[in-house]
């Protein structure tokens, strides 16, 4: 991405929701590299898909020659951002937040280049400047510059104040001041002149711009990326099992890959613009090819490959594709023990069983069948496979060789109904 028209290119991809003084920012970018930042609060032990667009936006700026600062909120994570939240957040302990800070910092690291000369990325933690600040300094040096009248009129806060059942604590109300001071600190320390974030962060970003101007007399800018929505109106980044996480221990690479494979046709080309580094021309060509092929579109597979490789690397992608292919073909010989562990984590329904169980009981316990009687009929009709092999004997008891790696047996009813037995 060329730096001179970077904002225009981001807009073409649908990646700009709001921007302050767009003309002045474009001029500043045209003058040469800048430093910019995006903040990630440790509200859990992993980032999720909602964090991916701003994180990739940092990467896009770095590829254009700019210096990204990834700020993990060791201090703000102790307070909690009230922006557009229906209720007060639960406060986590300092030990928990510090543990999450470490995990998120490691998670962010692979997306950015921390060793590439002038525009090497920087990892920062706002606990470094808030940890030892006393309340008098906070009120005199920061609080003095904020108008309560303006703060309560910010949309993110106003929504909470207007709810009869929920007010807002002073703790969460002060969050806006903390994030504003982050921008001022990073401007002074690293020359940061741009903050990016989700569109729900607009109020916090503009507060930081105003505070930086008051404290340092510097012009700085803000840019928000849109909160991603799906064409059918349902929430993006959620499955029946909850959020889709970037940590492979919370969402396996296989499950992550499948999430993208299941993208609706109405969303897929837009998501390619948001979540990949393919050019607009390549995405448009793929859309045209899919439209004229008369076959199932390729776009979902391209999207799943690109994003899974970005988040989980080549090894994670190949494991996800291998598991997908084996489940589709019914042949499990290519699967490793680690692949089965992914399936047990969240890939297919899983049931734990004691050794010595029979097939009918396994079908009932796994909820592949409602009763032993129904299980008997289904087995006899040749609709059950064990590790890809048909089994039509209703009196079948599992053998040692059915336990792959001594631990796993994969049952299938029909073509698509799976359950993984994990032997105790």
Swiss-Prot record:
One of its GO terms (biological process) is tyrosyl-tRNA aminoacylation. Magnesium is essential for activity. Inhibited by chloride and sulfate in the presence of 1 mM free Mg(2+). When the Mg(2+) concentration increases to 10 mM there is almost no chloride inhibition any more. Inhibited by diphosphate and AMP. Chloride strengthens the diphosphate inhibition and weakens the AMP inhibition. Chloride weakens the binding of Mg(2+) to the RNA and thereby the interaction between the enzyme and the RNA. Acetylation at certain lysine residues could significantly impair activity. D-tyrosine is a competitive inhibitor of L-tyrosine for the formation of tyrosyl-tRNA(Tyr). A motif ('HIGH' region) lies at residues 42-51. It catalyses: tRNA(Tyr) + L-tyrosine + ATP = L-tyrosyl-tRNA(Tyr) + AMP + diphosphate + H(+); D-tyrosine + tRNA(Tyr) + ATP = D-tyrosyl-tRNA(Tyr) + AMP + diphosphate + H(+). Keywords: Acetylation, Aminoacyl-tRNA synthetase, ATP-binding, Cytoplasm, Ligase, Nucleotide-binding, Protein biosynthesis, RNA-binding. A motif ('KMSKS' region) lies at residues 235-239. It is an enzyme of class 6 (ligase). L-tyrosine binds at residues 37, 175, 179. Acetylated at Lys-144. Acetylation at Lys-144 leads to slightly decreased activity. In vitro, in the presence of acetyl-phosphate, can also be acetylated at Lys-67, Lys-85, Lys-90, Lys-230, Lys-235, Lys-238, Lys-321 and Lys-377. Acetylation at Lys-85, Lys-235 or Lys-238 causes dramatic decrease in activity. This is Tyrosine--tRNA ligase. The lineage of its organism: Bacteria, Pseudomonadati, Pseudomonadota, Gammaproteobacteria, Enterobacterales.
């Amino acid at each position: 991405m060329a730096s001179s028209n970077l904002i225009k290119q981001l807009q073409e991809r649908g990646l700009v929701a709001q921007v302050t003084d767009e003309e002045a920012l474009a001029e500043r970018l045209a003058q040469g590299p800048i430093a910019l930042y995006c903040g990630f609060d440790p509200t859990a032990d992993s980032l999720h898909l909602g964090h991916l667009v701003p994180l990739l936006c940092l990467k896009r700026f770095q590829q254009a020659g700019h210096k990204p600062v990834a700020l993990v909120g060791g201090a703000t994570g102790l307070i909690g951002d009230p922006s557009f939240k229906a209720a007060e957040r639960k406060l986590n302990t300092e030990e928990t937040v510090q543990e999450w800070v470490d995990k998120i910092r490691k998670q962010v690291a692979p997306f950015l280049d921390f060793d590439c000369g002038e525009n090497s990325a920087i990892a920062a933690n706002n606990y470094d400047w808030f940890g030892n600040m006393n309340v008098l300094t906070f009120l005199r040096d920061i609080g003095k510059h904020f108008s309560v009248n303006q703060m309560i009129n910010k949309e993110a806060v106003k929504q909470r104040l207007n709810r009869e059942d929920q007010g807002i604590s002073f703790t969460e109300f002060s969050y806006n001041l903390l994030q504003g001071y982050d921008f001022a600190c990073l401007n002074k320390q690293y020359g940061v002149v741009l903050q990016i974030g989700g569109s729900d962060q607009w109020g916090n970003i503009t507060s930081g711009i105003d505070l930086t101007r008051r404290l340092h007399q510097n012009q700085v800018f803000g840019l928000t990326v849109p909160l991603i929505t799906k064409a059918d109106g349902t929430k993006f980044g959620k499955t029946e099992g909850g959020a889709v996480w970037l940590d492979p221990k919370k969402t396996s690479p296989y499950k992550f890959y499948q999430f993208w494979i299941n993208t609706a046709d109405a969303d897929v080309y837009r998501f390619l613009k948001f979540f990949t580094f393919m050019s607009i021309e390549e995405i448009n060509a793929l859309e045209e090819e899919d439209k004229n092929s008369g076959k199932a579109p390729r776009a979902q597979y391209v999207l799943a490959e690109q994003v899974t490789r970005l988040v989980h690397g080549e090894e994670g992608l190949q494991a996800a594709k291998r598991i997908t292919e084996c489940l589709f073909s019914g042949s499990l010989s290519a699967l490793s023990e680690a692949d089965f562990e992914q399936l047990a984590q969240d890939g297919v329904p899983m049931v734990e069983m004691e050794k010595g169980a029979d097939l009918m009981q396994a079908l009932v316990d796994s909820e592949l069948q409602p009763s032993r009687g129904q299980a008997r009929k289904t087995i006899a009709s040749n609709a059950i496979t064990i590790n890809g092999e048909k089994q039509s004997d209703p009196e079948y008891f599992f053998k040692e060789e059915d336990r792959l790696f001594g631990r796993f047996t994969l049952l299938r009813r029909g073509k698509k109904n799976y359950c993984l037995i994990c032997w105790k």
